[in-house]
């Protein structure tokens, strides 16, 4: 074989080898694109929360080209179990304290991706219009169940009515109060009774469910209301092993919109606060 033929064979071989390498190099990218075309599965609680999240689903599709499939649940233990078992990519239903307890009790490896909304606890009154009007020695009613007791104390602390030993303790009790500048008298009662106590106390801290049943809205009637910085903000949560999936941040962006917030205000009679 002469030199020209040898050179030709070598060039053909080199080109063939390069083409093979290029095909191999491109294969993972093609696979990745195919995987990202799958709908993002997000778990939510059935009812108004699901209706509200449908607005985010629509925005994700129309603005970002992301398909989101909502999976609805009726029990609070289900969305984290489904996420843990990889039946979901994310869920949007729980607060920080609930998530921390689930991780502690069940060993789930979960990650916070972003905030959604706060269904705020608030303090209501028939005797004052502004918290500055609260007199020394006033009686303040709060829920008597552990999680809402702590939540009420944190709300009172946020507005300068008391100080807790650990200012971020979501399991705080009255025993954790170290300062009470207005000498308020705290009375604990069953959550369902608090709205009926408004005639007898200066202030009552009532959660959203029972306030709503009594026609009270934190937005319109609350004297003091939880803010977006509350540890009780609801979250978008994924697993640790998929927290870097870019589709998750796209879903969060789709949720954190005025359209979703306005739908939530309508569905929950003004009883929500933006968590972002």
From Swiss-Prot:
GO terms for cellular component: cell outer membrane. InterPro entries: Lipoprotein_NlpA. A lipid is attached at residue 20 (S-diacylglycerol cysteine). It is a lipid-anchor. Keywords: Cell outer membrane, Lipoprotein, Membrane, Palmitate, Signal. PANTHER family: D-METHIONINE-BINDING LIPOPROTEIN METQ, D-METHIONINE-BINDING LIPOPROTEIN METQ-RELATED. This is Outer membrane lipoprotein 2. It comes from Mannheimia haemolytica (Pasteurella haemolytica).
């Amino acid at each position: 074989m002469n030199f020209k033929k040898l050179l030709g064979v070598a060039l053909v071989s080199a080109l063939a080898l390069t083409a093979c390498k290029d095909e191999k190099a491109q294969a993972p990218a093609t696979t990745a694109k195919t995987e990202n075309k799958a709908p993002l599965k997000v778990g939510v609680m059935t009812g108004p929360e699901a209706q509200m999240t449908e607005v985010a689903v629509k925005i994700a599709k129309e603005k970002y080209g992301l398909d989101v499939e909502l999976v609805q649940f009726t029990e609070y233990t289900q969305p984290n179990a489904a996420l843990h078992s990889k039946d979901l990519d994310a869920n949007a239903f729980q607060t920080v304290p609930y998530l921390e307890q689930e991780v502690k009790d069940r060993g789930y490896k979960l990650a916070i991706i972003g905030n959604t909304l706060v269904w705020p606890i608030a303090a209501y009154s028939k005797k004052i219009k502004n918290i500055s009007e609260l007199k020394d020695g006033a009686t303040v009613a709060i829920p008597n169940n552990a999680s809402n007791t702590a939540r009420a104390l944190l709300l009172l602390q946020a507005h300068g009515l008391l100080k807790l030993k650990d200012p971020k303790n979501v399991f705080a009790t009255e025993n954790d109060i170290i300062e009470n500048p207005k000498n308020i008298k705290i009375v604990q009662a069953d959550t369902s009774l608090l709205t009926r106590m408004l005639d007898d106390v200066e202030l009552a801290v009532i959660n959203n469910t029972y306030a709503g049943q009594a026609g009270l809205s934190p937005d319109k009637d609350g004297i003091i209301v939880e803010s977006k910085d509350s540890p009780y903000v609801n979250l978008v949560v994924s697993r640790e092993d998929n927290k870097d999936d870019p589709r998750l941040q796209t879903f969060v962006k789709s949720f954190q919109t005025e359209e979703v917030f306005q739908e939530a205000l309508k569905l929950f009679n003004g009883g929500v606060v933006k968590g972002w």
